[in-house]
Amino acid sequence: MSQEKQVFSIDLAGRQLTVETGQLAKQANGAVLVRYGDTAVLSTATASKEAKNVDFFPLTVNYEERLYAVGKIPGGFIKREGRPSEKAILASRLIDRPIRPLFADGFRNEVQVVSIVMSVDQDCSSEMAAMLGSSLALSISDIPFEGPIAGATVGRINGEFVINPTVEQQEQSDIHLVVAGTKDAINMVEAGADQVPEETMLEAIMFGHDEIKRLIAFQEEIVQAVGKEKSEVKLYEVDADLNQAVREMAEKDMHSAIQVHEKHAREDAINEVKKRVIEHYEAQEADADTLGQVNEILYKIVKEEVRRLITVEKIRPDGRKGDEIRPLASEVGILSRTHGSGLFTRGQTQALSICTLGALGDVQILDGLGVEESKRFMHHYNFPSFSVGETRPMRGPGRREIGHGALGERALEPVIPSEKDFPYTVRLVSEVLESNGSTSQASICGSTLAMMDAGVPLKAPVAGIAMGLVKSGEHYTILTDIQGMEDHLGDMDFKVAGTAHGVTALQMDIKIDGLSREILEEALQQAKVGRMHILDHMLSVIAEPRTELSAYAPKIITMTINPDKIRDVIGPSGKQINKIIEETGVKIDIEQDGTVFISSINQEMNDKAKKIIEDIVREVQVGEIYEGKVKRVEKFGAFVELFSGKDGLVHISELALERVGKVEDVVKIGDVITVKVIEIDKQGRVNLSRKVLLKEEQEKEAAKEENKQEQQ
């Protein structure tokens, strides 16, 4: 095919989307430059010529952010991009999930898809441009990809659905949905919503699919014009005779092993069957390739038998019915010194979530390509190896942990009270202590319990549940509360979180070509029933958020000052505010509108800091009377401190009724005297008088004496 530059365009949500091929990255198997508005993303696809000796499909998807895309130079000592941001990792997962199911089973060549964000227009999503670019790079390449796919962002404003909403529209939208799929079916959903009914979410998904069909037709035109012929790749297959022999040896025993209800006992039973078969072939001195094939066949036997039991015999590995939820157990307040804690257990899945409250100055500062500069609500998810009874090096969070943490954050954020109603930064950490499926949803339930225990006034409690699907031809079974084996061997992982009023988050990944509207609708309704059951259980443990915060949580008071006085509170180079912090031990956060947040564990220190700030911003008015301390004495008068940071001068002529020859004859440093403000000059200097008050007192006494004499 021609390597000349070619340009293709389509209108997308009122903005032009352009695809350029044949000019950049021509040594990649496939490469396109996608321009959407002023957003520009270069997407490339490359593949190894030979299959890798692994038992999985080695696909890597990278979404690379470059700060030059928004005209920024990276901060810090090393002026170049470091590890991927959380947003970049989530975008990589977003692109990976819809394209992964569209490679043939048995394809083992290594494939790498890279999207580099080169220019960002905030109203034109770089993630959606990268998703379309990744699909196109694969589709026009010689890599055997069974796409194309496309994605669309859907919002809803005043009841009307909007495709790829602008930043302004997103702020008004109660749905933030990313949907991807082929022209025939949906195969990926990622959504956050403000307690939206299931029926509305389904309509939003189908609305997005209509746009996907149009974008796929556009891609097909490009593939027709510039696409390469797909290379023929030998798919991995096991030897037919070996396959039959292993099945005859293992199928009957595996059928029994799979139906052991307890997870570890079931794994032991399955491993015992595998061990017996492997030892049989090792005794025959089988080579590594043969043993690898034996393992592959044994895996397929387990997968096929689990799926057959579910779809044909309607039996789940642990004996539950299709819509049955595992036993639930919850507890709150199990960690004394934390601000709030919640333990949620569902079968052999257990999550301990901890809520920490901080001042608004504890927000997470964001330095990426987005418009957001900070984040006051965070949810972090940890998955230690002991949760599945394994040993593994303890490293930082991987893509999975970041993805699960973000899903929980998205599910809970709609019910977090506003900064005005609850001026705290909220951080949640979910520690997965046991894992047998649905840990991300357990972390959502545990986090809700932890926040209620901490006294966070949630708009409504949130629960989450993971749904599964096993599909064989036209027959399918939808599973509620899937466990690890059902997730691993099934066709769908569909996570739904929400309140009693509606959905707050959705995430769907599937391993087959796509799902019909009917299956999606049934899964959503079945998930709602399960979610309500879990919510009832959680509310039986703690019915509403505690009315008082933990004794160890910071106390926050709010005050408002004149914005013109902010600089007085801060002082030159922060001298004044640092002095207050040092003196009281509080944290102080000041908004541009003059709102001041003072926080510390000690309420007395909060009040002290508030008094100091009130004194700093306080306006002195002519005619006001103060009781102040003499701070300095000069020949011409005495300087009196009216309140912290504000002095005035009592001229020697205003000290007493009689003539004063020497200031020290009337007052000395440290004396407390009552004075009246008689003038504020053009330079803001305050002139005080003691004499005026003495005269007023003298006149009152004289009037009293006169009245007394008249009465006699």
From Swiss-Prot:
Gene3D superfamilies: GHMP Kinase, N-terminal domain, K Homology domain, type 1, Nucleic acid-binding proteins. Its main location: cytoplasm. It catalyses: RNA(n+1) + phosphate = RNA(n) + a ribonucleoside 5'-diphosphate. It comes from the Bacteria. Residues 554-613 form the KH domain. InterPro entries: ExoRNase_PH_dom1, ExoRNase_PH_dom2, ExoRNase_PH_dom2_sf, KH_dom, KH_dom_type_1, KH_dom_type_1_sf, NA-bd_OB-fold, PNPase. The keyword Chaperone does not apply. CDD domains: KH-I_PNPase, RNase_PH_PNPase_1, RNase_PH_PNPase_2, S1_PNPase. Belongs to the polyribonucleotide nucleotidyltransferase family. Mg(2+) binds at residues 487, 493. This is Polyribonucleotide nucleotidyltransferase. GO terms for molecular function: 3'-5'-RNA exonuclease activity; magnesium ion binding; polyribonucleotide nucleotidyltransferase activity; RNA binding. Its EC number is 2.7.7.8. It is found in: Cytoplasm. Its cofactor is Mg(2+). Keywords: Cytoplasm, Magnesium, Metal-binding, Nucleotidyltransferase, RNA-binding, Transferase. The keyword Metal-binding applies. Residues 623-691 form the S1 motif domain. It holds the Pfam family RNase_PH_C. Involved in mRNA degradation. Catalyzes the phosphorolysis of single-stranded polyribonucleotides processively in the 3'- to 5'-direction. The gene is pnp. One of its GO terms (biological process) is RNA processing. SMART domains: KH, S1. GO terms for cellular component: cytosol.
